[in-house]
Amino acid sequence: MCQKYDTLSGDRDVEHDEHFVLEDYDSESEDQNISSKSLGHSSELSMSTLALLERFKKQYSAPTEEEETVGDDEPKIFYCSRTHSQLAQFASELRRVEMPPSLPKELSEKLTDSEALEERVKHLSLGSRKNLCINPRVMKLENATAINERCMDLQQPGMAVEHRCPYLPSKDDEPQVLQFRDHTLATVKDIEDMGKLGKHIGVCPYYASRSVIKHSEIVTLPYPLLLQRSAREALGLSIKNHIVIIDEAHNLMDAISNIHSVTITLSQLQTAIFQLTTYARKFKTRLKGKNRTYIAQVIRLVSSVADHLRSIQGSNQPPDGAVKTSDLMAGKGVDQINPYKLSHYLQESKLARKVDGYVEYSKDTANRQSHGKPSTPVLFHVQSFLLPLMNPSAEGRLFYMKDQNDIQLKYLLLDPTNHFREIVEDARAVILAGGTMSPMSDYMNHLFPYVPASRLDTFSYGHVIPPENLVAHTLAQGVMGCAFDFTYESRDSEKMIIDLGRTVATLCQAIPDGVVAFFPSYDYLSRILHIWKKPLGADKNQTILGLIERKKPILYESRDMTTKSDDILQEYTRTIDSGSGALLLSVIGGKLSEGINFSDRLGRGVLIIGLPFPNIRSAVWQAKLQYVEQKAYSGSSGSETDRQMIAKAAGRDFYENACMRAVNQCIGRAIRHRNDYAAIVMIDRRYDKPNIQGKLPAWIKQSMVRSPTQRPAGATVQNLIKFFAARGSLD
């Protein structure tokens, strides 16, 4: 664990092996404060970590009391969103803000225009190493985990000077760090600007930005850096008594769950076993203390998990299901393992770094020179799964999912409440914001159940457009009179799907320019296209797809991850600009359902086909609903019957909310500015139900037009023609 190897060297000298050997692990004191998470006690830190801290202590002089307190008492705004592109858009808007002068009014009035100082908000963009690293040798790794680990490697005390990161700020670089701080605060910069500034000055923007935090007024950062305690600690980020604003908050609960969930495959486990075994054999005579014992325990534990997955894979069990922790840890000798000690060892010994480093170093020279894309260090991934496995949470569950050639094991966080609670309790105020946050009940029930109602305020504002710029229709029947029922039991009706195609063709004739149709899933879109491509009757050249294409050219959103959303959008835009209009077939929850703006001619019509209810038969959703119902039952009072009814209602509400949040996101892709206008058509008889309509945003409900029971499709089409004619969109 002491000196780190030089992974960039091509030498294969035996001497290099010593750099991969774990330092003697002292377990005598591991029982002391083993559950403590504080880094303030040196007894909990490994020797190399202490050496690293000592080196940094020497590099940086202790700040004066004045320096330490500058900006600490001033309230800051931490603005958080899902992607860096959304944060860059916020930074762009922030540049337009004119701040009032901080000089007293009587002094500022005496200044001439030429003397007046233009003041900007002090803004800082924070990002991960992957977004801010400027070291070419590290940037080329591309994978976030590999970048993080290589960065840490280059800081190890034993790293040769010529191979250390030249951009890591030290005591001698203090002028550059101050220059970086001053330039950062001088103007509003997005994450790309921060990288460019770091390159220009020659200092790492990831580390240099830490010194800017306490001098900032607004700090922007992506979800993972705020929602993960370890990320906040790594950045030295405290939100105590500050204001937290979370944009795109409809994603918040899923984001918290995803950050604290881990998925691993059987093939990754098998690779980890092979690598650990190879490492243990290679260094068996040089591993001292408890290292050999703990490595053997890790191998036994990983083997036990892999064996159980293999037994599931070879059985007739369903494609997915719940897994008990006890079953995963039922292997030979695993019951003798102390999970708390082993968890502590994995975090302190840096075993994953040593093993993954040795594997990387030991690759065949030809492979290392082939410039292939590096993969995620597999043992780090396995370790991230083992930690929650050995420290199970009441809010977490384990599931397996069979693939064609592999099987996955997933640890899923079911309840985000406690992980978000520490943010809520530290911050002066927490603001959740979003364009389409309806329905709202989930935020109250699953993010703030412990907060008194008197401390919670909700605000809902109308859309920027006047109501007459939007028309929203529900459509329960097609042009051929077939009822639109896209429930699981009825959705494969060929007759209904054909009528859907004819109805879409008719709607495309009534709606000008671009129309975006959203389907519940990629699989169902494929099913529909299969039927639409079939010949109609005796004429083998006539198909439903051809009928639609005579109205508008059709483009598809592909499930293929190699197909970029930007490429689809560019082709879609070019087709519309040619004057022919276009129909874009997309998927709810897909690449084009969020974060993409179909403004003006790109989105004159939005069609929502069916309701994207999650698969209630899946093990994951059964566990989610069971957890929500049990939580509601435990928190209720009254008779047993009343409590059971409350529990069932809570589960049903949670299930419907998940569906309608996705629908509302798709609807929100159109209507992007005050002069925009569009038509929304929701195609399914269930959209007429009050409980479903009640979960639509208020600005949609006020423009809702319910079609008549007789010939509803014809009435809808006529209404759309009038709507667009009134806006001069039709010839």
Swiss-Prot record:
Q: Enzyme group, top EC level?
A: isomerase
Which reactions is this enzyme annotated as catalysing?
Couples ATP hydrolysis with the unwinding of duplex DNA at the replication fork by translocating in the 5'-3' direction. This creates two antiparallel DNA single strands (ssDNA). The leading ssDNA polymer is the template for DNA polymerase III holoenzyme which synthesizes a continuous strand; ATP + H2O = ADP + phosphate + H(+)
GO MF annotation terms: ATP binding; ATP hydrolysis activity; DNA binding; DNA helicase activity; iron-sulfur cluster binding; metal ion binding
Segments carrying the region annotation (Disordered) are: 1-42
**In which residue ranges is the amino acid composition biased (Basic and acidic residues)?**
9-22
Q: What is its EC number?
A: 5.6.2.3
- Subcellular location(s) of the protein: Nucleus
**GO CC, any one term:** nucleus
GO biological-process terms attached to the record = establishment of sister chromatid cohesion; interstrand cross-link repair; mitotic G1 DNA damage checkpoint signaling; mitotic sister chromatid cohesion
Q: Helicase ATP-binding domain spans which residues?
A: 1-299
Cofactor(s) needed: [4Fe-4S] cluster
Motif DEAH box extends across: 247-250
Coiled coil feature spans: none
Q: Which UniProt keywords apply?
A: ATP-binding, Cell cycle, DNA-binding, Helicase, Hydrolase, Iron, Iron-sulfur, Isomerase, Metal-binding, Nucleotide-binding, Nucleus
Enumerate the residues binding ATP: S35, S36, K37, S38, L39, G40, H41, S42
Q: Cofactor comment in the record?
A: Binds 1 [4Fe-4S] cluster.
Superkingdom is: Eukaryota
For this protein, the record's PANTHER family field holds: ATP-DEPENDENT DNA HELICASE DDX11-RELATED (PTHR11472:SF41), DNA REPAIR DEAD HELICASE RAD3/XP-D SUBFAMILY MEMBER (PTHR11472)
Q: Which family does this protein fall into?
A: Belongs to the DEAD box helicase family. DEAH subfamily. DDX11/CHL1 sub-subfamily.
Q: What does this chain do?
A: ATP-dependent DNA helicase important for chromosome transmission and normal cell cycle progression in G(2)/M. May have a role in changing DNA topology to allow the loading of proteins involved in maintaining sister chromatid cohesion in the vicinity of the centromeres. Has a specific role in chromosome segregation during meiosis II.
Q: What protein am I looking at?
A: ATP-dependent DNA helicase chl1
Q: Which organism is it from?
A: Aspergillus clavatus (strain ATCC 1007 / CBS 513.65 / DSM 816 / NCTC 3887 / NRRL 1 / QM 1276 / 107)
Q: Which gene is transcribed and translated to give this protein?
A: chl1
